[in-house]
C-alpha cells in the first residue's frame, strides 16, 4: 500500500504526482489489472510461455 503525506507548503498536485510515482513503482496498478478477472492456471501457463517465447525471439 502506497502512502503519501502532504508536506508543508506542498501543492496538492505535487503530492498527487509523488503518490502516482509511488504506486507505479510499487506495481500496484499492474497487479490490480492482472487480478481483475480470474485466470485459469492453464491460461496463465500459456500466457507465460508465449511471453517467454516473445522475449527469446528478440
Curated annotation (Swiss-Prot):
Q: Which GO terms describe its molecular function?
A: structural constituent of ribosome
- The transmembrane residues are none
InterPro entries, per database record: Ribosomal_bS21, Ribosomal_bS21_CS, Ribosomal_bS21_sf
Composition bias of kind Basic residues appears in: 43-58
Could you state one GO cellular component term attached to this entry?
ribosome
Keywords attached to this entry: Ribonucleoprotein, Ribosomal protein
Family stated for the protein in its record: Belongs to the bacterial ribosomal protein bS21 family.
Entry-linked PANTHER family:
MITOCHONDRIAL 28S RIBOSOMAL PROTEIN S21, SMALL RIBOSOMAL SUBUNIT PROTEIN BS21
Q: What is this protein called?
A: Small ribosomal subunit protein bS21
Q: Which organism is it from?
A: Streptococcus sanguinis (strain SK36)
Amino acid at each position: 500500500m502506497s502512502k503519501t503525506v502532504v508536506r508543508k507548503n506542498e501543492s496538492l498536485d505535487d503530492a498527487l504526482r509523488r503518490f502516482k510515482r509511488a504506486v507505479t513503482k510499487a506495481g500496484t496498478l499492474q497487479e490490480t489489472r492482472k487480478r481483475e478477472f480470474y485466470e485459469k492456471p492453464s491460461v496463465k501457463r500459456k500466457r507465460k510461455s508465449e511471453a517467454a517465447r516473445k522475449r527469446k525471439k528478440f
